[in-house]
Amino acid sequence: FQLAIFTSAKGNYRYARLFPKQDTLCFQESHAFFFEKLGKVYKTLVYDNMKVAVKKFVGPSEKEPTEGLLKLSTYYGFKFRFCNVRSGNEKGHVERSVEYVRRKAFAFKENFISLEKANEYLDSICDELNQKKQSYNEGRNAIEILEIEKEYMLPKMPLFDSARIEELRVDKYSTIVVNGSHYSVLDKLVGKIVLVKIYSTLILCYYEGEKVAQHERKYGFNEWSIKFEHFISTLNRKPGALANSTAMLQVDPRLKEIYKNYYIKKEREFIELFTIINEKGLDEVLKVIKSLKSLSPLDISNEKIKVLLNRHKESSHPVNMKNCEILENSRQMLEQYKSLIPISDKGFVEEALL
């Protein structure tokens, strides 16, 4: 992974984020996340001579910026300049920050279940570093100095959308191809043109203004990201193909276990289960299945799942406060009527004797 780091000149405020590559998308996203974190925009940024910022060298000291950098500068309104070649004194500040943050963050922990978790951890480490008192800044920390600097910074802008947008045709496998990797969409869209937004870690697909697919981006060659729910119509026509399908290979491991335990030779019912999941959500369905396992582990069916889901829905309805007020008023009226009725029948007996 590539590490992007921003460091302020005065207060040494540090922001870092990991990306899959060092390309224009990651370069632009790093700025967007940095300014979003700050809540403001620095008026001037100084860059090392990296390829994603410098398109080409025009002369001994002149450099032409890339289109990606120009778009960021135009959108956020900041100015920029580049370090001079072979001038370590100009870029040493940032290079030391790279080494410092990397050592503090990953010296003792380097394995994470996902890039998202790694970035959450890295963000927490940067927050800790930014809270340290600095003797050379009168005992103030980086966050305190940043608050002073914000008075002279540019206003916050909405998050910059760095996506690369393409229009792609859905192939016969019901997938679109981005940089050699396949991503599934709804099987009814075969042959159609879909709008694809490509981010550094995400692929979003739209058809007629509606989002029809979302995938984590793949960076290997000829990798496939297949989602089961995109092929429900096809599998309904050919349920026997379910067990050995690519969609089944990439399904959630918890659902694979449910299939093995309760839906072998019941492929059509398992496909129907995915329709229920699309409506109610995976977590809710898994909770219901867990409840059914405790009651009747050998008899789990879609009908029972639907019944329990409906019960949960009814029990989760919010209490109508208006009805509660009516009920309380009714109780008070009954109490008043009760006070009018004698506790014993002695009075009635005496009245009858008279």
Residue ranges and their predicted role:
Residues F1-R14, D23-C26, D161-V178:
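Mobile-element integrase/transposase regions
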Residues V41-S61:
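Acidic/histidine-rich, metal-coordinating catalytic segments
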